[in-house]
Design a protein with these regions (language model features):
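N-terminal regulatory/effector-sensing and dimerization cores
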Residues: 2-93
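Amphipathic alpha-helical segments enriched in hydrophobic/aromatic residues interleaved with Lys/Arg
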Residues: 88-114
């Protein structure tokens, strides 16, 4: 896996919208730190804070602030098909929101990567 751009504790205003109608073009990992609205492959979702998502390159997605501000940690990366398969075999649910009980530890790891 090759990590590209990384962001830690980014906060955006109520008008924030990130839109990838054809997908982000590479893998995108998000640690959502505030309530947010997502459109994931045409399905509307409301996510709570402490939700992780690991998007594949061609997954259509759009996300925005739910109430006031949107905050997240994130990184873009590329990986080989073998690396993706290894993560899937370890239980990584790509393109699927998942609550985490370890948000603080995960955020600290992303901060150290940045």
């Amino acid at each position: 896996m090759k990590i590209g751009v990384i962001g830690h504790n980014y906060t955006h205003g109520a008008d924030f919208v990130m839109d990838y109608p054809k997908g982000p073009g590479c893998y995108l990992f998000l640690l959502v730190k505030s309530p947010a609205r997502f459109l994931l492959n045409g399905k509307k979702l409301r996510l709570e804070k402490n939700t992780i998502l690991f998007f594949t390159p061609h997954t259509a997605c759009r996300y925005a602030a739910e109430n006031g501000t949107y905050t997240d940690d994130w990184f873009y990366c590329n990986m080989t098909p073998e690396e993706e398969l290894a993560l899937r075999n370890e239980g990584m649910p790509f393109d699927t929101p998942m609550q985490t009980q370890n948000a603080a530890e995960l955020s600290e790891l992303i901060r150290k990567m940045a």
